């Protein structure tokens, strides 16, 4: 949760705390916050221990699907398609279909067809079946 909290962010939080709470109340607020976090951590570890005792070996069986869900959580739709439907081959999505195989020389793309001749001015063609 706080893994991306850098020293710069901590410094900004301390400065904001000094401005908002003042130097008299800031140490008490820090103490209260650290105690609340410690109590929450103790509560969560107690719940985990109790679940482990109640479920026994089934607890490990429960962890396997949860870890798979955690892996899927950060996947983008493109990564999910690539992994599950395309077996990791994303050439369908990137458009890199024709890669040279075994060092074969790549052929240059064909020259584009000349543009069609513009329509001659005059009466617009009429199609009785189309109307």
Curated annotation (Swiss-Prot):
Database matches in Pfam families: TatA_B_E
Domain of life per record: Bacteria
TM helices/strands, residue ranges: 2-22
Entry-linked InterPro entries: TatA/B/E (IPR003369), TatB (IPR018448)
Gene Ontology MF, one: protein transmembrane transporter activity
Region (Disordered): 96-131
Record key words, sorted: Cell membrane, Membrane, Protein transport, Translocation, Transmembrane, Transmembrane helix, Transport
Record localization: Cell membrane
GO terms for cellular component: TAT protein transport complex
Example GO biological process: protein transport by the Tat complex
Assembly notes: The Tat system comprises two distinct complexes: a TatABC complex, containing multiple copies of TatA, TatB and TatC subunits, and a separate TatA complex, containing only TatA subunits. Substrates initially bind to the TatABC complex, which probably triggers association of the separate TatA complex to form the active translocon.
Known function: Part of the twin-arginine translocation (Tat) system that transports large folded proteins containing a characteristic twin-arginine motif in their signal peptide across membranes. Together with TatC, TatB is part of a receptor directly interacting with Tat signal peptides. TatB may form an oligomeric binding site that transiently accommodates folded Tat precursor proteins before their translocation.
Family, as annotated: Belongs to the TatB family.
Protein's name according to its UniProt entry: Sec-independent protein translocase protein TatB
Organism (species): Mycobacterium avium (strain 104)
Gene: tatB
């Amino acid at each position: 949760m706080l893994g991306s909290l850098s020293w710069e962010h901590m410094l900004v939080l301390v400065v904001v705390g000094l401005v908002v709470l003042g130097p008299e109340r800031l140490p008490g607020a820090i103490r209260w916050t650290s105690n609340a976090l410690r109590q929450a951590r103790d509560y969560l570890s107690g719940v985990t221990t109790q679940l482990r005792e109640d479920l026994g070996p089934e607890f490990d069986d429960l962890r396997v699907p949860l870890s798979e869900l955690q892996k899927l959580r950060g996947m983008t739709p493109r990564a999910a398609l690539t992994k599950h439907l395309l077996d990791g081959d994303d050439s369908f999505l990137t458009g890199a279909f024709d890669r040279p195989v075994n060092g074969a020389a790549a052929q240059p793309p064909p020259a584009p067809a000349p543009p069609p001749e513009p329509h001659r001015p005059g009466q617009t063609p009429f199609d009785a079946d189309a109307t």
